[in-house]
Amino acid sequence: IIPDIKIKGALVQLGDLKINRDNWDNKFIDENPFWCPDRDSIKSWKKKINSLIDEGDSCGAVIEIIAKNVPVGLGAPIYGKLDSDLGSAIMSINAVKGFEIGNGFDAASLKGSENSDEMRIKNNKPTFISNNSGGILGGISSGQDIIVRFAVKPTSSIRKERKTIDKSQNETAISTTGRHDPCVGIR
């Protein structure tokens, strides 16, 4: 739609294993099976996946998407908010159970003075000092990078036996055989 916009996604958390953001390398994302930006995380992530396969279990994941060169003014302050539209689209993806923009849920533990995005004039233009809002203020794009993250649940279709009931309400157990995704967030 807008040719200058560049969108890139990466897996930033596999189960309880998070990347080290200081090691972020955009080029490395396409070079590994996890779409991970942190080269140092790969060994532990492989070990985690192999362990889950052996156990017949699964884990969740967090994916981060960054959109660069988004123009100022997309969205609306009341109806048609950009953050609402993005949330609706992302939450429509199977297995997604959480969505955040910018500081997201971490903002709940911050003060307003810590979370707000202050501005200054740089090269005769208004410039943000931070991007805690993830590039969206009041439902409208601010011109900064739009940063969103979403959480994908662990799949319940696992080999590991789980308690359930049958159609006659008898207690029983279930185990899924065949294809087993240890983490659907990698897909």
Regions found by a protein language model. Give the residues of each.
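Glycine-rich anion/phosphate-binding loop at the beta-strand->alpha-helix junction
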Residues: 56-59, 63-171
